[in-house]
């Protein structure tokens, strides 16, 4: 259970960072 919660939290953090990077790359291209 603890491992599952850790994986979920880690996944959310990774997605948040990935979206930020992807967003900045997209903005950089359009600008």
Curated annotation (Swiss-Prot):
GO cellular component, one term: extracellular region
Entry keywords, A to Z: Disulfide bond, Hormone, Pyrrolidone carboxylic acid, Secreted
InterPro entries named in the record: Insulin-like_sf (IPR036438)
GO molecular function, one term: hormone activity
Main location: secreted
Superkingdom: Eukaryota
SUPFAM superfamilies cross-referenced by the UniProt entry: Insulin-like
In-chain residues carrying the UniProt-annotated modification Pyrrolidone carboxylic acid: 1
Subcellular location(s) per record: Secreted
SUBUNIT field: Heterodimer of a B chain and an A chain linked by two disulfide bonds.
Reported function: Relaxin is an ovarian hormone that acts with estrogen to produce dilatation of the birth canal in many mammals.
Family (UniProt): Belongs to the insulin family.
Protein name (Swiss-Prot/TrEMBL): Relaxin B chain
Species in which this protein is naturally found: Phocoenoides dalli dalli (Dall's porpoise)
